[in-house]
A protein has these predicted regions:
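Membrane-water interface of alpha-helical transmembrane segments
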Residues: 1-2, 257
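Non-catalytic cap/lid and distal C-terminal segments of serine-dependent acyl enzymes
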Residues: 17-281
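Hydrophobic membrane-insertion alpha-helices, especially the h-region
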Residues: 2-16
Length: 281
């Protein structure tokens, strides 16, 4: 029985690894950029419009967790006329758990990045909480690369899911000028006793005090009604802060009924794109 269970576990792990590796190459244009900030090579999946013209200007969407949900993004963008002039850039994770938590978790949220508390041996700041470095890679290396190889307009979106959603909120809070649209699907904003929620509220509050220099921003947040209570609580906290302080931010949020954590980002893609397109027109 033990041998059979071990074999079954091995097969299950092999299937998971295969699915991950199968998505480490895309059906689009794959490029590799050496990052001096991260001191590693980073692969990027690029979806160019079907009628791409080198001298034409295009909108830009950058999304984290580039290994995940790429097919859904492709199919939705193919159906929406407004997205025919958009370049989609997906940044895959190097290794699912380690570099994902390292790259996407904000530096002020280094504790308890799972729905169950980490044991002390796995709670080292070296393991996660370096979103500032990942953002520096996007700002200082990826965006300049894209701007030097493609003509881009001013419509730029950052999208993320779960830990990537907390990264979206972190980016919007610290360097809001990098993008004019932000999508946070099932954002894991509950980290460290809702630290991400609190920091986002602080950003909104400070922004509301001085509106003269604010650039136009739009934000779309979703969560599934069947997700973990911590996720739903964080979602409620974000909504509360937006209702109080949002002022000039164009935003909307949605609870997708009956959807769990892995299901919500699939449904959210079209919802977010429709919202963004309406907000800039």
């Amino acid at each position: 029985m033990i041998i059979l269970l071990s074999i079954a576990a091995f097969i299950a792990c092999t299937i998971v690894i295969y699915k991950y590796n199968a998505h480490y190459t895309s059906n689009f244009k794959d490029i590799t950029i050496y990052s001096q900030v991260l001191d590693e090579n980073r692969k990027v999946f690029m979806r160019l419009p079907s009628n791409f013209e080198p001298n034409k200007r295009y909108s830009l969407i950058i999304r984290t967790d580039g290994n995940f949900n790429l097919t859904q993004w492709d199919s939705v963008m193919a159906e929406l006329p407004a997205q025919q002039d958009t370049i989609l850039v997906s940044i895959p994770n190097q290794f699912w758990t380690f570099t994902r938590n390292r790259d996407l978790v904000p530096p002020y949220a280094r504790q308890d990045v799972n729905t169950q508390a980490r044991p002390p041996s796995e709670n080292s700041p070296e393991l996660f909480g370096k979103a500032d470095q990942f953002l520096a890679f996007i700002e200082g290396e990826l965006l300049p690369y894209l701007e030097s190889h493609y003509k881009l307009d001013n419509n730029r979106v950052l999208s993320g899911y779960s830990a990537g959603g907390s990264f979206v909120l972190y980016t919007m809070s610290t360097k809001p000028w990098l993008f004019n649209g932000y999508f946070a699907f099932s954002p894991a904003a509950w980290y460290d006793d809702m630290t991400v929620v609190k920091e986002f509220a602080r950003f909104l509050s400070q922004r509301s005090l001085n509106t003269d220099d604010n650039i136009p921003l739009s934000l779309y947040i979703t969560v599934g009604s069947a997700e973990h209570p911590l996720m739903l609580s964080a979602f409620a906290g974000l909504n509360n802060s937006l209702n109080i302080y949002a002022n000039d931010i164009i935003w909307d949020s949605r609870i997708n009924e009956g959807l769990e954590h892995l299901e919500n980002p699939v449904v959210s893609v079209k919802q977010a794109l429709d919202f963004y397109n309406s907000s800039i027109n």
